[in-house]
Each structure stands twice: as structure tokens, then as C-alpha cells.
A protein has these predicted regions:
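Short beta-strand segments
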Residues: 8-9, 36-39, 76-78
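N-terminal basic/disordered segments at the start of proteins
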Residues: 11-31
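Short, contiguous strand/loop micro-motifs
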Residues: 9-10, 50
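Extreme N-terminal starter segment of soluble prokaryotic enzymes
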Residues: 1-6
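Ribokinase/PfkB-type carbohydrate-kinase core domain
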Residues: 44-94
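Surface-exposed, flexible loop/turn segments at secondary-structure boundaries
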Residues: 13, 41, 81
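N-terminal glycine-rich anion-binding loops that anchor highly charged ligand groups
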Residues: 28-42
Length: 94
């Protein structure tokens, strides 16, 4: 089985950054990405219009249901202190 990389990152609809690029990069290095989306970035080729952070309870649900053990955790954009604490909890779990 391939090594698991747990990714916390935002979703960029232009695929120029965030979870889409992270997942592609993880795949390119021969590992398997497991991604938890932390935000949605409303943007186009001219720039970012808005960043919508997911409620920390949604992030927590995704953390709590994980049934794989990541070898690496990659952290991107995190919205607030509560979400940071949840990501820290995930690090402690693994």
C-alpha cells in the first residue's frame, strides 16, 4: 500500500493552489492523498474575491471519521484558532 499523506487545505476552483494541487503533487511523488477541505476560495483568473472557511465542526467530522494512518500531514490554509486546534488534535492522533 502507498504511503498516505493527509492534506488540510482550501479548495481553489482554478486549481492553481490548495487541495487540488496538493493532491496532484502527492500523487506525483507516489503517495496517496487523503484530503480535508478547510475553505472554499471564490476566485477567477483575475484574483481572489472571497475566502469562505468551513465551520470547524465540519473539519472535526472529517478528522473523526479517518480510518487510515497518514505517514505525513500537509497543512495549508486554516481559518481560525478553533480549526487550528482541531488540526493539532489530528497531528496528536497520528
Amino acid at each position: 500500500m502507498k504511503d498516505i499523506v493527509l492534506v488540510f487545505a482550501g479548495y481553489d476552483q482554478t486549481a492553481g493552489a490548495g487541495v487540488l494541487v496538493d493532491a496532484r503533487t502527492v500523487t506525483c511523488i507516489g503517495a496517496h492523498p487523503v484530503c480535508i477541505v478547510t475553505s472554499f476560495v471564490v476566485q477567477n483568473t483575475k484574483g481572489v474575491k472571497e475566502v469562505i472557511f468551513l465551520d470547524p465542526s465540519v473539519i472535526e467530522k472529517h478528522i473523526n471519521i479517518l480510518d487510515v494512518k497518514p505517514k505525513v500531514i500537509k497543512i495549508g490554509v486554516i481559518g481560525d484558532e478553533e480549526a487550528i486546534k482541531l488540526v493539532s488534535k489530528a497531528i496528536d492522533l497520528f
